[in-house]
């Protein structure tokens, strides 16, 4: 059974506002070295080269862009970029539950890639049930977006503490990569994501992810980044920017 998807005007407005944040950005490669500490030196493919996002516009330009988007949408201009977290630029996109938020943020991801070349995205959700629902939504819209974006291919990765090669692939692949994780997977020092791991030659999964400077999308933020510990955990992802 095929499902027909239609983009509604308010969804387009939300996508356009998010994309406008980076106006002036040009497509730039951002490669980094993934150190292989294994004696055999066989853990990493492609000579241990990681691929990430690189924002080149400065804070002043970004704030001008944000103010432009706010004025276009009848919102009072902000005087800073940081919202409830001072560690990285963060922006609120207000949409009610049931209005197609997952559809909107996937379309936003693809627009950010099309216009600016961004490749790495992390979606943080409050629970396993929501994580599975988000993954299902992302899967069933793949064909629709493939047609909308000239055959675009993107990789979906649900963080699994038992399959840490996913974190390595996320950091090293030169493709659009979308990781979906719960906040509980990385908000404590004892979490697998925050521990040195032999599967990754002694590296911590979160360090590989942070090297990519992902754009972070926080789903149901009232239940995700509502504590200081959660905010610190998200900051440890080293985001280029966040949408919530």
What are these regions (language model features)?
Residues 1-244:
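RecA-like P-loop NTPase motor core of helicase/translocase proteins
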């Amino acid at each position: 059974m095929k499902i027909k998807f239609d983009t509604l005007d308010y969804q387009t407005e939300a996508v356009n506002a998010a994309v406008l944040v980076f106006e002036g950005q040009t497509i730039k490669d951002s490669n980094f070295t993934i150190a292989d500490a294994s004696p055999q030196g066989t853990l990493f493919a492609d000579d241990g080269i990681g691929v990430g996002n690189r924002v080149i516009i400065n804070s002043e330009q970004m704030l001008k862009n944000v103010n432009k988007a706010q004025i276009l949408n009848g919102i009072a201009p902000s005087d800073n970029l940081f919202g409830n977290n001072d560690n990285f630029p963060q922006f609120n996109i207000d949409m009610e539950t049931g209005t197609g938020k997952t559809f909107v943020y996937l379309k936003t991801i693809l627009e950010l890639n099309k216009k600016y070349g961004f490749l790495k995205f992390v979606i943080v959700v409050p629970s396993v049930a929501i994580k599975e629902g988000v993954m299902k939504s992302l899967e069933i819209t793949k064909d629709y977006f493939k047609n909308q974006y000239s055959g675009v291919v993107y990789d979906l990765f649900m963080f699994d503490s038992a399959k840490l090669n996913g974190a390595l692939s996320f950091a090293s692949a030169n493709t659009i990569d979308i990781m979906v994780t719960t906040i509980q997977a990385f908000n404590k020092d004892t979490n697998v994501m925050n521990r040195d791991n032999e599967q990754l030659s002694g590296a911590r999964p979160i360090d590989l992810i942070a090297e990519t400077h992902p754009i972070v999308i926080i789903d149901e933020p009232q239940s995700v980044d509502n504590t200081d510990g959660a905010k610190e955990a998200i900051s440890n992802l080293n985001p280029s920017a966040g949408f919530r």
